[in-house]
A protein has these predicted regions:
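Short, low-complexity, intrinsically disordered N-terminal peptides in bacterial proteins
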Residues: 1-2, 227
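ABC family nucleotide-binding domain
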Residues: 4-219
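Conserved switch/coupling elements of ABC/ABC-like ATPase nucleotide-binding domains
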Residues: 220-226
Length: 227
């Protein structure tokens, strides 16, 4: 099977005053095309830092992060921006929606860096994206008019409208109640299967991790794969 990610000896070191903190420590990992891997671990043990490295939001202090053979740490800022805009979709715990934009406008904003086709085509794509997450009737609503679960559905539509190869999700259900959590994870699993996405999902929730094909645990910056 084709490898989408290959990480070799990846470390990330930050300075905290007079001391250094190794948030990610010598991680080796491969992720196959179309695979779903869940990363678990306690707060502050490097999960989100690892996801930032996978998404090109940060560069490793040492080691290599290859995405489809391209070394993300060696790409220019402009090249990384292009990769993030086309190949990777991001979903965050706090939704990261623009409060003054409607659901449809928040989703459409993801197409702006791509200079996607005309307004009519963008609107059609936005409508299809919102329909795919069950929010066709909420297109004109502001985030403040939506529940937490609905806001996360908008965020999922925004991540997927670019038709990325990779979906990176950082605690996507952390702000949701148990029932809504189950609905959002079921939706993500459905979209993952339908679209053949490569999904890396960070969560402290064991119930979510059990749905993934593989699970890894981060502890003090070290990654251990579980069967």
């Amino acid at each position: 099977m084709t490898q989408v990610y290959e990480l070799t000896g990846v470390s990330k070191v930050y300075r905290a005053g007079a001391r250094t903190v190794e948030a990610v420590a010598g991680v080796d990992l491969t992720v196959d095309d179309g695979e779903w891997i869940a990363v678990r671990g306690r707060t502050g043990h490097g999960k989100s830092t690892l996801l930032n490295l996978l998404g090109g939001l940060d560069r490793p202090s040492s080691g290599r992060v290859l995405l489809d053979g391209a070394d993300l740490g060696r790409l220019s800022d402009a090249e990384l921006t292009r990769v993030r805009a086309t190949a990777i979709g991001f979903i965050f715990q706090t939704f990261n929606l623009v409060p003054t934009l409607s659901a449809a406008e928040n989703v459409e904003a993801a197409l702006i860096p791509l200079r996607a086709a005309g307004a009519a085509q963008r609107r059609r794509r936005v409508a299809a994206a919102l329909d795919s997450v069950g929010l066709a009737d909420r297109a004109g609503h502001l985030p403040s008019e939506l529940s937490g679960g609905q806001q996360q559905r908008v965020a999922i539509a925004r991540a997927l409208i670019k038709e990325p190869k990779v979906l990176l999700a950082d605690e996507p259900t952390g702000n949701l109640d148990e029932e809504t959590r189950d609905e959002i994870i079921a939706l993500m699993e459905k979209l993952w299967r339908e679209r053949g996405l490569t999904l890396v999902l960070v969560s402290h929730d064991a119930a979510i991790a059990r749905r993934a094909q593989r699970t890894a645990v981060m502890s003090r910056g070290h990654l251990t794969l579980r069967s």
